[in-house]
Structures are given as C-alpha cells and as structure tokens.
C-alpha cells in the first residue's frame, strides 16, 4: 500500500486469490475495517498482511481519531404536535431547518403556533379607525367586520380534555365497553371494540366518547317481559348507560386518547418460578397483558372557534374591549381608495388612559403599508426630542403621500386624520377620522367559556346557598354593592326574592313550585344564613333571644331555631 495514496488500490491475499478492494468489498459483510485516508486498519478479519511498524503506529492514531468522531453525541429535539396547553389552546411546532443544513448555537430550529421567524407573533395587523358608530363601541366595545370571521383571521384552535373513570359500586364494578344497553348500533359505529371513540373522529353534541355501564339492582321482570326479550334475542343485563358524551353545543375532532390502567388480572403459570421451587407455583402469579381493562380514559377534543360577539380583544397598549357587533363588509366605513375598515374603536378610550402610543402605532402602520417598509421603534424614544415620535410618524405619512400620489394619506390641515365614507349610505362623514393599521390580538377570554345559566342546582351544605362558579353549575353572586343598587331603585320584592327563596330559604323554595301551580301566595321563610349567624353568636356565649308575634299580638320567645318558620 502506498502511504500517500488516496485510492483504494490495496491488494490482499484471501483463499490464495488476489482481489481488489472496491466500495462493495469495504462495506460488505465479509470485510470489516475502518477507513482513514491514507490508512487501513483491520479489526475483525484474518488476512495475512505485512504492515510496517511506522504504518501500524500511524494507523493506531488514525483509528483513535475515527473512534472519537463515532462517539460524538447527537442532540435530538422532539417537536410537539397538537398538544394542549394549560389555557386549553393549541401547541404545535414546525421545523424551520432541513436535513443537511448547517446550524450553530443560537440558530432557530423550530417555530411554534405563536411565533414567526423566532419572534413573538400573537395577533394580526388590521385596518382600524377611532370613531363612534351608532353606539356599538360605547364603553370600550369593538365593532368588527365580517371579513375577520369569513377569512379566519382570528380563528383559534382549542383542545379540551374529558375524562371518565370506572369506580367500584356496591353492586359491582363499572366497565368500559361497547356493549351499551338500549343503544342502537348506528350510534356506536365510531367506537372501537373497547368502547372508546376512534382517533380522528368528528363528534357532535350528545355523541358517545367512551362507553361505560354501571351495574344496577336486578328488577323483577314478569313472564311477558322475559318472553319478549327471548323473542328479540336480547339479554337481561342489569346495567345502565353511564357513558361519557360530547358536551352540549360542541363540534370537535378527537386528536388524542390516553388510556390508564391501574388494575391487573393475575393467573398462575408454571413458567413463573424457577424449577427448584416449582412446588410453590400455586402462590405465584403473572401478569396477563391481554386481560388488562382500561380504568381511566382521557379524550382530547380539538375545536375551531371563530371570533364572535362577546369575545375579548386587545391591542399592544392595554386598549382592550368586547366585540359588540359584526358588520357585513359592505356596511363598514371605507377609505377614499375603497378599502373597507376591519375594526372601529372608541376614541374616548385614548385620552383618559393616556396611552397615546396606539395612535402613533396605527398611523406609522398606515405609512408602512403604502411604503412597504418595516419599522422597529424602541421604547422611550422621546429621549431624542420632545416630539420625536410625532415628527417621525408625520414624516413617513408625507413620504407615503409623495410616493403613492395618494393625497388623502397626509393632509397638512389635519395631519393624522382623513376623510372616510359611510358604508351604508356612501356619504362622507362630517369630520375627518384617525385611520391606520394596528396590531390587534384575540384574548383567551372567550364568550363560550363565560356564558352560563342556572335554574335549580347544587347548594352549599353549611349556608344552603347556591354554589359559585360556572364549573360547579353555580349561581350569580348578589354582593353587598348589588344589594345597595337594588335598594336605590326601590325594587323591594326583587330584593326579597333574591335574599330568600332564590338563595337559602329552604322551606320557601320547596313550596314555591306547588304554590305557583295552585295559584297560592308564595310563602317566605327564614333564610338559613340568619340561623347560622345566630348559632355563631350563641357559640360566643351570647344570649340571643328570638321573639315572634302570636295571634293575640304579643311577643313570645322562640326556644329553638328549628321552630323558626
């Protein structure tokens, strides 16, 4: 072998025949050696070779260098896809590099759902105007265009988890199965053999997600019923349907299913213990994986939510508000070039809060739209002068006017404002309006998660008042200041209902329904909170006496709280 050669021209003697090593010979199954130009090091073959001591010494160091390259660690990053965040939003990561790209420390490898090019990107740049519009943006309300809904500008994906768990009852254990009584087969087509919804299924309101049955007490069945079940070839299963179903008003897709098993079935076998102690095989047990049954199932549903009336939006300057109305595109105010606006904000939300930066943002955004430029303004730029922001913004608007020949972009008489037109009548508005492009965000406070109604629900054990909170199916709290407001209006009977039969008057709310049906006067009892207060004062060793008027008009003392009406 030539020491400085870069070609594979080495000849070896194998079975008394000479052959030339090619690429196939090197990487084949017969010959295994490590290559380092210009050295060859043999590791697992038995070829008779004659290598000089100098070449052997050089090959040793070359082999060590190759092994050091082979032992290098490779960093592996697993990207998340369609995962759920703590706010029930979507977590998805998309790679920004391809195989073979050279990267170094600090380079961007992947983007998430809320970033673009490694920068935070949570909202959209849209056309806005600061003007009142028929009272629909009163008190920080927001008027938006139908374009934001149809083009999915603010459509978000939310993932919610629903869980079902089997419990042990007095009559037996609950089971997760697809054999649900009194459910037709067409309503179970989307379930697998275990009774769990298939991955990727689109589900709607009331559809079964996880089939579960609960044992019930066996009822006496007459001979006619038994004959009927025999004719229909149905079994008398003492089970009731307790399946997990899709919540009301939800249309979503199943994106993930987690099955948790806590109980295992055991069975003895001869292979469990070694031969010297086979006599104890009756006490040995082995896990049978095929007989595992799910005890807890978590189903993750992904839902698309378009922006709607009641959703909360905000800008980058704390200018938040609630969507009050969605107007058709043709009814929105439009610019002199015919561009319809996307959003109308209330101008009264600017001076009182002193966040004038939103005005500079929307005007500079308008200039950047027509100049096709991108501006990055650092905070506290007034260090360059008292009017640095205003001067820079007006200069860019004037530059956009000169380059595009759109004179309405900058008017020296009222800089930063322009004449726009009513979309419903086509007539221009009386006064010029501030119009621009601002960065607006959709917040996680959605109306679907806020809206709630209650008729009759759970009550607290101590105070006997309705529970609070939407998750507990609670009621609306009537606090101290709300009571003052009702008192100020003089609504005495509404206040009486709120504090008694709608709250913690046990006897009153039990007789309310029957009294209404029988056209009888509504009975008002004593609130339970008053009784709790008396008991707490008596626990402090205070003698609290309760008196009531008898039929003769005299006061008589009530000996016990249970005697209160």
Curated annotation (Swiss-Prot):
GO terms for molecular function: DNA binding; DNA-directed RNA polymerase activity; ribonucleoside binding. PROSITE patterns: RNA_POL_BETA (PS01166). Its EC number is 2.7.7.6. It catalyses: RNA(n) + a ribonucleoside 5'-triphosphate = RNA(n+1) + diphosphate. InterPro entries: DNA-dir_RNA_pol_su2 (IPR015712), DNA-dir_RNAP_su2_dom (IPR007120), DNA-dir_RNAP_su2_hyb_sf (IPR037033), RNA_pol_bsu_CS (IPR007121), RNA_pol_Rpb2_7 (IPR007641), RNA_pol_RPB2_OB-fold (IPR014724). It holds the Pfam family RNA_pol_Rpb2_7. The keyword Cell division does not apply. The keyword Plastid applies. Its main location: plastid. One of its GO terms (biological process) is DNA-templated transcription. It is found in: Plastid, Chloroplast. Keywords: Chloroplast, DNA-directed RNA polymerase, Nucleotidyltransferase, Plastid, Transcription, Transferase. It is an enzyme of class 2 (transferase). GO terms for cellular component: chloroplast; DNA-directed RNA polymerase complex; mitochondrion. In S.obliquus the gene for this protein is split in two. DNA-dependent RNA polymerase catalyzes the transcription of DNA into RNA using the four ribonucleoside triphosphates as substrates. Belongs to the RNA polymerase beta chain family. In plastids the minimal PEP RNA polymerase catalytic core is composed of four subunits: alpha, beta, beta', and beta''. When a (nuclear-encoded) sigma factor is associated with the core the holoenzyme is formed, which can initiate transcription. This is DNA-directed RNA polymerase subunit beta C-terminal section. It comes from Tetradesmus obliquus (Green alga).
